[in-house]
């Protein structure tokens, strides 16, 4: 398959409609052909390093080494101090991807213009009918996020330039952007209105505009939602908690899985599915004041599981069900598990340790400062491990104790005993790949008696 730009012309995309569960609305996505996807991906790889060198410092979406947690950390830094600005402009770009001006893209995106024009004007087929594309970029193109980011880069400078002073007051007009969601802090409501007008002028040049429904100016005492979190101050104290909308959405997700799907799958699969949801949600919200929310979610999960068990075993009493499927831990907590395997259990969010997220250094570039981002990724992996288990992760340096290879982000890991199964001390525990667990029994039975094997594993872990 040739990816030479000479005589290249993108074929019309295929339009599909998907339901956005979070926003309860339909999304229209145009999907390119396989060859066009390859060409788009090639130019995305070319454009990404360029966009990194020109991006706003406090833009955090769809960028290597940056995340919503970094955006959260900078929002906290902007409003948590006693002398921080108290007025917040919350804004959202209306239909950002669909409305970017093709003329602006052609004039400002530095890749092969002929290929770029072909991407933009490919059109789409829907219901066997061909439609032209006059503006916007398709969500189905991997390059679209980069183009959208570049179209919004420059907002930070526009806001700073509004202050008309030789020494910029960085606390006034503090700007944070995650995709098309924008937060700007201000000392006064009047200056916040001025910032809003400047953003609207900036967007109009690019064919975009702010969403009237989602754009507002609020006082920090009222609080505001951003990226599924609620930020507010009460009696001078700053708080961050999961937003009501995020909690309700997660509760609905759990109910749908436990009640609707729980009857169709095994108990082991049910526990595995619940744990995956809980750990993912807690991993995102553990950087907030989430302890009360975590306890609430634990109660929700227990009540849903009890409701499910009553449906499955209508002839059993509630006490019989609890005695069979719940056991009491040393601290008195009731835990849902397999009756024959108490170690296969539903995790409790109450046990999750809250942490502070160390935000990215703003002037670091992932294409230049690779060592910094590698070390940061390693420290984040350690942070995902709770309590005393961190020392095991550090000891193994992120490598499987069985095979010696590194753990990748998408690989499941398992905690196993190295020697006696009765010894649960940290010194007797190690992490291995889930895929290595099939060899675990044979490995434990040898009790690592082969000195050559022990030395080899130690060498791998120390690499």
Identify the meaning behind each predicted range.
Residues 404-441, 445:
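Histidine-centered nuclease catalytic patch
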Residues 392-397, 425-429:
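Short metal-coordination and nucleic-acid-contact micro-motifs, chiefly zinc-binding Cys/His arrays
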Residues 121, 206-279:
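A conserved non-catalytic segment of reverse transcriptases
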Residues 45, 49-61:
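Charged boundary/loop elements
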Residues 300-304, 309-388:
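Extended C-terminal regions of large enzymes
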Residues 375-376, 446-463:
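Acidic, low-complexity intrinsically disordered tails
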Residues 3-6, 16, 57-58, 70-202, ...:
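Conserved polymerase palm-domain catalytic core
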Residues 385-391, 418-423:
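Short, intrinsically disordered, charge-biased short linear motifs at domain edges
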